[in-house]
Design a protein with these regions (language model features):
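C-terminus-biased signal that marks the final domain/tail of proteins
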Residues: 2-5, 9-179
């Protein structure tokens, strides 16, 4: 059982259980895209949170949903233009690589692109993932896309538009495989 923890600030936190056989990619931004407060304050099967989170959300008018389904990304996320350079493109590339056939990732009719703010928080991979898969995405630089800063082919207008995952300032990576 794996739980994904997000700290919100002001001593508030939330956690969501990662579904069995699913993976999460989240580069430097708040990632949980849906949160069930009823479960968090009830059975706690898939959601946990600080005891005063509901009041914190209400008192600060943070629930921006129209349908009553809390989206923590909307409520607590950064909403910064820099996310579209540094964070969402990296999540897009990892999801695109690990689930290449689940969605349309490229072109004008793409379901998700490098600037999408609604990328899935977790996905079930199309095949079993290996440590080599994780190593590949964590050392990637958008290879095979128009955004590859090292590519010597194709349209150069978008070359290097987004921060790569694998850069010379990355000093540490940990990969744990549990059986």
């Amino acid at each position: 059982e794996i739980w994904w923890l997000e700290t919100i600030g002001g001593h508030h936190w939330m956690a969501r259980r990662v579904p069995d056989d699913a993976y999460v990619v989240m580069p430097n931004q708040l990632g949980i895209d849906a949160f069930d407060l009823e479960d968090a304050f009830g059975a706690q099967e898939n959601y946990l949170c600080s005891s005063d989170l509901r009041e914190f959300i209400r008192d600060n008018h943070l629930d921006l949903s129209l349908d009553g389904c809390l989206n923590p990304r909307d409520a607590f996320g950064s909403h910064d233009d820099a996310d579209h350079v540094y964070n969402t493109p990296r999540a897009w590339f990892m999801l695109r690589h690990l689930n290449p056939n689940t969605w349309v990732w490229d072109g004008p009719a793409a379901d998700y692109g490098p600037r999408s703010d609604d990328l899935p928080w977790c996905m079930v991979p199309e095949r079993k993932l290996t440590p080599e898969d994780v190593k590949y995405v964590l050392s990637s630089h958008y290879q095979g896309t128009p955004f590859d800063p090292y590519a010597s082919y194709g349209d150069k207008s978008m070359k290097g538009a987004y921060r790569s995952i694998g850069i010379n300032r990355n000093d540490f990576m940990a990969l744990i495989q549990m059986r």
